[in-house]
Amino acid sequence: MLNDVINEYEAHLKKATEALRHHLASIRTGRASAALVEHLHVEAYGTNMPLNQLANISVPEPRMIIIQPYDTGMIKAIEKAIQQSDLGLNPSNDGRIIRLPVPPLTEERRRELVKMVRHRVEEVKVSVRNQRRDAIDDLKKLEADKLISEDELHRGQERIQQLTDRCNRELDQIGAEKEAEVMAI
């Protein structure tokens, strides 16, 4: 029972870390990356679909993204989705493919992006703290119901705190790496 609570908590930490990595991948840096646009939602065939299901996305050079729709009739919808996103990119098309030049970031925009990164890291840390509280409450309930001993409760709390500390260090590292990537010219 103790291990069930700890394993469930550890699974939540992994999910939170992966969610942060996924979110930060979509934040623009000075370099072109398919991750910037692949999850943009495009109004297509009466529903919203991620761009990576509608087109082939490639990065032939460091400051250019090429989007080649499987159906050329989707070009206007894809351009609209890119323009409505907060990426600050201006698409151009030749009727078959969309070229997406990625201009260098201004110093001001870099600072805004760093703030976004820090804010997102903090949101995930709050989620981790809330989950830690819930896991410890679950352990206390097990102890109150006499399903685990007081010693097991303390061991479980220590293990949960160790996992939390390790996760927070990893989240800080992920955030610092993204900040460095954003600030690199």
UniProtKB/Swiss-Prot annotation:
CDD domains: RRF (cd00520). This is Ribosome-recycling factor. The keyword Protein biosynthesis applies. InterPro entries: Ribosome_recyc_fac, Ribosome_recyc_fac_dom, RRF_sf. It is found in: Cytoplasm. Its main location: cytoplasm. SUPFAM superfamilies: Ribosome recycling factor, RRF. Keywords: Cytoplasm, Protein biosynthesis. The keyword Cell cycle does not apply. One of its GO terms (molecular function) is ribosomal large subunit binding. Transmembrane segments: none annotated. Responsible for the release of ribosomes from messenger RNA at the termination of protein biosynthesis. May increase the efficiency of translation by recycling ribosomes from one round of translation to another. Belongs to the RRF family. One of its GO terms (cellular component) is cytoplasm. Disulfide bonds: none annotated. GO terms for biological process: translational termination. It holds the Pfam family RRF.
